[in-house]
Amino acid sequence: MSRRHAAEKKVIPGDPVYGSVVLERFINKVMLHGKKSIARKIVYGALERFAKRLGLENPLEGFEEALENAKPVLEVRSRRVGGATYQVPVEVAPDRRSCLAMQWIIKHARSKPGKCMEVGLANELIDCFNKQGATIKKREDTHRMAEANKAFAHYKW
């Protein structure tokens, strides 16, 4: 057992436009090289495009639904037993779920062709909202991998 105390969770204030902590975390993940104003401009622009294309009144509700659709429930973790390494399916913690969903959305938005991140992010959010696209495929692949290794579920720790 570690003698050190558990690190305290840093409290993130909500973003200035919508007052959402989740959106501020998303902005922090989009940010590169400490350029937060650029990250905010990208995210807010993408949210406006997203809401306009889907005809939503409140872009924040649509964003939260898209994020919810991208969250994984199960994942596999490597567990060494004897000389063999098994992929053991485990349930994903709530904080990690949202973190993984955000990472996947941003990764697939950046990999979309074209120069503008704002457009790519808006398109990826629309795909997540409609339960299709690369992020949802990644989530389904993660679930499929966990389902395939269900036989090793008794190796949980």
Curated annotation (Swiss-Prot):
GO terms for cellular component: cytosolic small ribosomal subunit; ribosome. It comes from the Bacteria. One of its GO terms (molecular function) is rRNA binding. The keyword tRNA-binding applies. Pfam families: Ribosomal_S7. One of the primary rRNA binding proteins, it binds directly to 16S rRNA where it nucleates assembly of the head domain of the 30S subunit. Is located at the subunit interface close to the decoding center, probably blocks exit of the E-site tRNA. This is Small ribosomal subunit protein uS7. It comes from Chlamydia trachomatis serovar D (strain ATCC VR-885 / DSM 19411 / UW-3/Cx).
